[in-house]
């Protein structure tokens, strides 16, 4: 609900009490945005819901409310329509005043959270000794956008990268490298990430078929857990090599994270099992220690347990996740803990959340949220793969997007007979390519699968990053052409006369509502939809209204609308992790 809607809601609530008495305090006036401009800007539907309770016709109830309703500073006189709708149309003078106010506000009228909280956002989380692939794309950019929005709202956000840096895979890899390439375990940078991945695959194949090697690998895990100096040194080298490769991608995507991998929680795992045992939740089942859960059954309908300690005494993901959750509550003091992973892990989160609640580890004021997302599909509608059927490397995907953007820009420059430096072309291609990939993902409802298409995401028309970057650049083109410094435009300059000015003005004032919605529901696509609609409304205004050639005071007013649109686009896109360009 935006600031204007909030004001109207308060006035309607007061009118309800004035008309029908204190018993109606707190009744929701059911105020919604009008579905059609002919009904005004907002519509209150409360009269219809009260008809039975009051024993009156809805139109009579609406009339009684309107008689007590004081919205003269905000709206034209309210109108009663149909069976009893109260239609409210915002005054032009009110819109002008609101825009003049936000012109001087760096936050563009978006209030910070009234009660800032400490929030953890767990996202990206690649595995050591494996390359980041297209599956990491969604978690990384959705998590980053959520973190940016929460930070903008004033929350204390800890961005956590729960990397897979512990477990059996390291025993396999270290054991294999001791045989075939021991220098990799003692020398920094002996391997690049491609070599590491190749060796990991060979180690896995060997582990799956060679029982003697399995035992050797397990012994390496035992040595690692015991802190044996040579094994620990080898592990650190392998982690550091992967970490450097991850950082290349994070810098390309402008992602900031605090790494706190699985190994961080290793000392806490035995305590998790002990405490679950003390609380009476643990049951031994076929040698493993488990917690049986409500609402989870296997195919035979039998209760499904969550294993927290395997029959061989080892721990698993669930144990680590329980340890990390308890640490985030007790040590980080987080009040909302958000996990951004694929939808396929939904059951896992529901299970270990339930165990933590049963154990009494979740205070009433702590909220746990799993933010699930769908798959990235190829244009054939199947899971996105390379032509050879391999998983697409994230580095390759991003490089290809920049390459496509570079080729598109070169073609456009030739058509326009424009000369630009290679430095300009490379920078624009980088920004457009990376932005296109991010926006194509974020503009989808995260719970849905989406089809990955370079051609669609780089299109200058439609709901794409290039379209909005172009609108932003167009506005700065106006300032260059007119030699205008937007920062020096006068205050109280907005005068709304044309219908496209009014439509743009109303939309500019909805930013606070959109950001508040994303803050609560963690759906960045709502911000994308808003920015796309805003861009369209600006283009309609641009096509219908003269700007630089207009007479004063209309000229300055329209330049203020240009400035507010550009600032809103820049702010909104920055919350999606997207950089803007003043020239394209």
From Swiss-Prot:
Q: Which organism is it from?
A: Nostoc punctiforme (strain ATCC 29133 / PCC 73102)
Q: What is this protein called?
A: Arginine--tRNA ligase
Q: Which GO terms describe its molecular function?
A: arginine-tRNA ligase activity; ATP binding
Q: Does the keyword Oxidoreductase apply?
A: no
* GO terms (BP aspect): arginyl-tRNA aminoacylation
Entry keyword Aminoacyl-tRNA synthetase: yes
Similarity remark? Belongs to the class-I aminoacyl-tRNA synthetase family.
What's the EC number here?
6.1.1.19
Q: Which GO terms describe its cellular component?
A: cytoplasm
Matching entries from Pfam families are given as: Arg_tRNA_synt_N, DALR_1, tRNA-synt_1d
Q: Which reaction does it catalyse?
A: tRNA(Arg) + L-arginine + ATP = L-arginyl-tRNA(Arg) + AMP + diphosphate
Intracellular or extracellular location(s): Cytoplasm
**What's the domain of life for this entry?**
Bacteria
Q: How does it assemble?
A: Monomer.
- Which top class of enzyme applies to this chain? ligase
**Keyword annotations:** Aminoacyl-tRNA synthetase, ATP-binding, Cytoplasm, Ligase, Nucleotide-binding, Protein biosynthesis
The record, for PROSITE patterns, names: AA_TRNA_LIGASE_I (PS00178)
Query: Where is this chain primarily localised?
Result: cytoplasm
User: Where does motif 'HIGH' region map?
Assistant: 126-136
């Amino acid at each position: 609900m935006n600031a204007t809607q909030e004001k109207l809601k308060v006035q309607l609530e007061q009118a309800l009490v004035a008309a029908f008495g204190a018993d109606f305090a707190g009744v929701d006036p059911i105020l919604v945005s009008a579905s059609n401009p002919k009904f005004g800007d907002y519509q209150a539907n409360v009269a219809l819901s009260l008809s039975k309770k009051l024993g009156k016709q809805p139109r009579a109830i609406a009339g009684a409310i309107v008689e007590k309703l004081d919205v003269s500073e905000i709206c034209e006189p309210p109108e009663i329509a149909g069976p009893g709708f109260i239609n409210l149309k915002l005054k032009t003078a009110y819109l002008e005043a609101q825009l003049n106010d936000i012109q001087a506000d760096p936050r563009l009228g978006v209030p910070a959270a009234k009660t800032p909280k400490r929030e953890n956002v767990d996202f990206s989380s690649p595995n050591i000794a494996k390359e980041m692939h297209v599956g990491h794309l969604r978690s990384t950019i959705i998590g980053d956008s959520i973190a940016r929005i929460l930070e903008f709202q004033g929350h204390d956000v800890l961005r956590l990268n729960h990397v897979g840096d512990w477990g059996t895979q390291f025993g396999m890899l270290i054991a294999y490298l001791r045989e075939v390439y021991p220098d990799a375990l003692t020398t920094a940078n002996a391997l690049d990430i491609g070599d590491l991945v190749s060796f990991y695959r060979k180690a896995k194949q060997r582990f799956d078929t060679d029982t003697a090697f399995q035992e050797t690998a397990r012994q390496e895990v035992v040595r690692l857990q015991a802190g044996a100096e040579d094994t620990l040194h080898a592990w650190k080298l392998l982690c550091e090599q992967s970490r450097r490769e991850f950082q290349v991608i994070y810098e390309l995507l402008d992602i900031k994270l605090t790494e706190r991998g699985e190994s961080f929680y290793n000392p806490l795992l035995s305590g998790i099992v002990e405490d679950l045992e003390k609380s009476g939740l643990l049951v031994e089942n076929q040698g493993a220690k488990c917690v049986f859960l409500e609402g989870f059954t296997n195919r035979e309908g039998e209760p499904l347990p969550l294993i927290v300690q395997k029959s061989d005494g080892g721990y698993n993901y669930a144990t680590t996740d329980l340890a990390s959750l308890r640490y985030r509550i007790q040590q980080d003091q987080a009040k909302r803990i958000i996990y951004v992973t694929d939808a396929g892990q939904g059951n896992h989160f529901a299970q270990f959340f339930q165990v933590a609640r049963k154990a009494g580890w979740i205070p009433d004021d702590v909220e746990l949220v799993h933010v699930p997302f769908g798959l990235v599909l190829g244009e054939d509608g199947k899971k996105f793969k390379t032509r050879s059927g391999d998983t697409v490397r994230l580095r390759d995907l991003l490089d290809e997007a920049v390459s496509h953007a570079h080729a598109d820009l070169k073609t456009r420059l030739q058509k326009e007979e424009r000369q630009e430096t290679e430095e300009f072309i490379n920078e624009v291609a980088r920004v457009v390519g990376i932005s296109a990939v991010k926006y194509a993902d974020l503009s989808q409802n995260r719970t849905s699968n989406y089809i990955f298409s370079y051609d669609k995401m780089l299109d200058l028309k439609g709901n794409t990053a290039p379209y909005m970057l172009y609108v932003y650049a167009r506005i700065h083109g106006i300032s260059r052409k007119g030699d205008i410094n937007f920062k020096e435009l006068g205050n109280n300059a907005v005068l709304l006369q044309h219908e496209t000015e009014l439509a743009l003005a109303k939309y500019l004032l909805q930013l606070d509502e959109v950001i508040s919605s994303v803050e609560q529901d963690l759906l960045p696509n709502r911000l994308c939809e808003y920015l796309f609609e805003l861009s369209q409304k600006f283009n309609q205004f641009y096509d219908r209204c003269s700007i630089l050639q207009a007479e004063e005071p209309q000229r300055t007013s329209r330049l203020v609308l240009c400035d507010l649109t550009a600032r809103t686009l820049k702010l909104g896109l920055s919350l999606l992790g997207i950089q803007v360009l003043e020239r394209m």
